[in-house]
């Protein structure tokens, strides 16, 4: 245990997701040993992000303007909408360079244990986006866990009367993975989602 501002810094860093006490301590001592200009720049960037970044008025992704760059891009296919839980999921899908539609960020997943219900998510905004009939396919890309599955099922039932095609991301074995280490659910999904091998 340290005293004063050093311990305050360690405590604050430890509040960040994925940062445990040891990592917080390492980062704190890195900051202490860093050049003052680097520390000042880090502090400025943190403040700048908090002041300038907002959520896109259309999809809920992070943005510096009213619309994010994806919603503002006329080359994106407006007929395909990919629903994700968080902005970080948009980044993950964009890295594939395979998806050319638009997104809708829910801001989480249904989780009764955590007190998060449908009204706590951006589901009302999703329905408003679907109302004009432009979207023909809704891809549900929520996490493949209990909360993500519950959210996907809820949305699929909610959207069904609108006549929009609803699809779910395939799930299964990772590339380079070994079958013996796959859990039963993952292996079962991989079998369900199998496809013909064209040679």
From Swiss-Prot:
This is Recombination protein RecR. PANTHER family: RECOMBINATION PROTEIN RECR (PTHR30446:SF0). CDD domains: TOPRIM_recR. Signal peptide: none annotated. GO terms for biological process: DNA recombination; DNA repair. Residues 79-174 form the Toprim domain. Belongs to the RecR family. GO terms for molecular function: DNA binding; zinc ion binding. Keywords: DNA damage, DNA recombination, DNA repair, Metal-binding, Zinc, Zinc-finger. Disulfide bonds: none annotated.
């Amino acid at each position: 245990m340290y005293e004063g501002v050093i311990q305050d810094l360690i405590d604050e860093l430890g509040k960040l997701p994925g940062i445990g006490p040891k990592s917080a301590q390492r980062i704190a001592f890195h900051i202490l040993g860093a050049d003052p200009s680097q520390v000042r720049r880090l502090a400025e960037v943190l403040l700048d992000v908090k002041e300038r970044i907002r959520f896109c008025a259309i999809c809920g992704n992070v943005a510096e303007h009213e619309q994010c760059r994806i919603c503002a891009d006329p080359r994106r296919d407006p007929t395909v909408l990919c629903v994700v839980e968080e902005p970080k999921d948009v980044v993950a899908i964009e890295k594939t360079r395979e998806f050319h539609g638009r997104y809708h960020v829910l801001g989480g997943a249904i989780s009764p244990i955590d007190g998060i219900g449908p009204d706590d998510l951006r589901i009302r905004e999703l329905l408003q986006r679907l109302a004009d009939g432009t979207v023909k396919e809704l891809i549900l890309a929520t996490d493949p866990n209990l909360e993500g599955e519950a959210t996907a099922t809820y949305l699929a039932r909610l959207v069904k009367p609108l006549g929009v095609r609803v699809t779910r991301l395939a799930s299964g074995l990772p590339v380079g993975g070994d079958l013996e280490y796959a859990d039963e659910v993952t292996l079962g999904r991989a079998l369900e989602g199998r496809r013909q091998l064209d040679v």
